[in-house]
């Protein structure tokens, strides 16, 4: 789960990380009032969306008078910002962050992720701030310096100092960087984060370090113990179908194809998508109904899949282990009857009560194509979608 920049900076403040004075505003009037609270200009106004590339898309602007702040807010609030990280529709802008402008001398990068290879939180720092760290890693990997956090002892100040020296910092900047490093590491661990980025971490003309931007990603599996982060969730920044799926504990990811997929188990779901592609089709989604599938959840899964206008056929692939195939069949029959499915539905059932499930589908009188093998099912659904 991603957080907005203004939310990240609110958390930064609690952990002692320096950031420009700023206010998140939902109306043009609030934006003007925020500028008055901050003091004399210039100011920076930023659209708050869960996407990078805002500056190039016109979503970040330096302004010198309050009239320009109002104009910026009026132009963007309620609109959608399209960047290279969004889809063609863009992300809705509901808040504008108004901040004091910062005199920048140099831009750095500081971030952290969970490294599955080392099974540790790994911090990354670079002198190449203000640009995509992925690009730096690809073109000049030697400019990225790392520090792995030992889970037994936690972050250590010496690690921050080592990174500071590698970045060419000296004097008070080393102490400032070490404080930022320790605060950020504590924030990462205490809040169960999966990603944190300060890009850029700037050195001002006065020689001080400031967190000019902030990006936080929370581990969705740990949100049950992070109630404050759960409250920060902004569903408007998420795909509406994915948000709906989450309410029913369905794992759904929208894709660009035309064959809807409903599968139980993440591994089987990925394998199903692979075999659809292998036979010339294009999956419209990843959808895992999980091991505790019920008739109601299957019905909702159908509704979510069919809410995508691109879907020309639906492939239901169920291996009955924990979940019984006859219950899935009941859900499919109920969903097809309730939703009024007008596209072909190919169903492959294997495992627990598969024969009973297949009989229920056959006796339903509905236009459901039964498949006995995975390969055959893939070929049938691709043909039904008109891809071959």
From Swiss-Prot:
ATP binds at residues 46, 53-55, 99, 102, 107. Mg(2+) binds at residues 199, 213. GO terms for cellular component: cytosol; succinate-CoA ligase complex. Pfam families: ATP-grasp_2, Ligase_CoA. This is Succinate--CoA ligase [ADP-forming] subunit beta. Residues 9-244 form the ATP-grasp domain. Pathway: Carbohydrate metabolism; tricarboxylic acid cycle; succinate from succinyl-CoA (ligase route): step 1/1. InterPro entries: ATP-grasp (IPR011761), ATP-grasp_succ-CoA_synth-type (IPR013650), ATP_grasp_subdomain_1 (IPR013815), Succ-CoA_synthase_bsu_CS (IPR017866), SUCC_ACL_C (IPR005811), Succ_CoA_ligase-like_bsu (IPR005809), Succinyl-CoA_synth-like (IPR016102). It catalyses: succinate + ATP + CoA = succinyl-CoA + ADP + phosphate; GTP + succinate + CoA = succinyl-CoA + GDP + phosphate.
